[in-house]
From Swiss-Prot:
CDD domains: PanC (cd00560). Catalyzes the condensation of pantoate with beta-alanine in an ATP-dependent reaction via a pantoyl-adenylate intermediate. This is Pantothenate synthetase. Beta-alanine binds at Q62. It catalyses: (R)-pantoate + beta-alanine + ATP = (R)-pantothenate + AMP + diphosphate + H(+). Keywords: ATP-binding, Cytoplasm, Ligase, Nucleotide-binding, Pantothenate biosynthesis. Its main location: cytoplasm.
Length: 279
């Protein structure tokens, strides 16, 4: 089993030894409740770096709903066993007081790319993400960091963060891992009922149909409206957004020109699912 480090001091001592030996360090930031998507990131890190750290920290600052924070699954023993199978070198699993000690007063806010979509529906969420990610990069001194494309907006926020603050880490975006029926892997999926799980792939199917329609010349507003209607017809309770945006800055796209991204968030069984695909 990989060692589970609880303090910044332990982590820094370990990383200092690796750096002194000239080894490269990769980090995979997670909130635990690991699944095959996380493991694919760890494998990618394992292939690219001499040493791999996976962080497990349920970050209270990125939850704007306390009930969501409470419900978030915590499965550290299972997570460590899964990571052992991948061969990671260390797990960093600090408590909240280690990351945010008494008197902590700094907030990192990335404007622009963090504001629409998830930012509009979850105020403060990306400030919490940016703050903890900036801290993790400082703590781990990572050369590379691995993030899933499933959280596309988060990936864009992190890329902007490291560019603007000159943080010397390379951000690697890794393809979304999906179930056989197309559902994007997510720690939240385990909260779906059996019936909800069967309905959940309707989200990505509607998105794929919209992308195909737009490529075929369908007007963008019509294609998006049809996709939203299809998601609701499949049994989802709400659609927070289903929008076409530029891939990098997440600006609204009026026509297909350059790289676009179709991003969606919808609620099923009271569980908020997000997804995105290239267009």
């Amino acid at each position: 089993m990989p060692p589970v480090l609880r303090t910044v001091a332990e982590l820094r001592a370990r990383v200092s030894d690796w750096k002194a030996a000239g080894e490269t360090v990769g980090v995979v930031p997670t909130m635990g409740a690991l699944h095959e998507g996380h493991l694919s990131l760890a494998r990618r890190a394992r292939a690219a770096c001499d040493r791999v750290i996976v962080t497990i920290f349920v970050n209270p600052r990125q939850f704007n709903n306390p009930a969501d924070l409470e419900k978030y699954p915590r499965t550290e023993a299972q997570d460590a066993a899964l990571l052992a199978s991948v061969g990671v070198d260390a797990v960093f699993a600090p408590g909240p007081e280690e990351v945010y000690p008494r008197g902590f007063a700094t907030n990192v806010s990335v404007s622009g790319v963090s504001e629409p979509l998830e930012g509009a529906h979850r105020p403060g969420h990306f400030d919490g993400v940016a703050t903890v990610v900036a801290k993790l990069f400082g703590m781990t001194r990572a050369d590379r960091a691995f993030f899933g494309e499933k959280d596309w907006q988060q990936l864009m926020v992190v890329q902007r963060l490291v560019a603007d603050l000159n943080i010397p880490v390379t951000i690697e975006g890794c393809a979304t891992v999906r179930e056989a029926d197309g559902l994007a892997l997510s720690s939240r999926n385990r909260r779906l009922s059996v019936e909800g799980r069967a309905r959940a792939p309707a989200l990505v199917r509607a998105m794929q149909a919209a992308a195909e329609a737009m490529r075929g010349g369908r007007a963008i507003p019509e294609a998006l409206a049809e996709a939203r209607a299809a998601v609701l017809a499949a049994g989802f309770e709400t659609v927070d957004y289903l929008e076409l945006r530029t891939a990098d800055l997440l600006l609204p796209m009026e026509r297909l020109q350059g790289e676009g991204r179709l991003l969606a968030a919808a609620t099923l069984d009271g569980v908020r699912l997000i997804d995105n695909i290239p267009v």
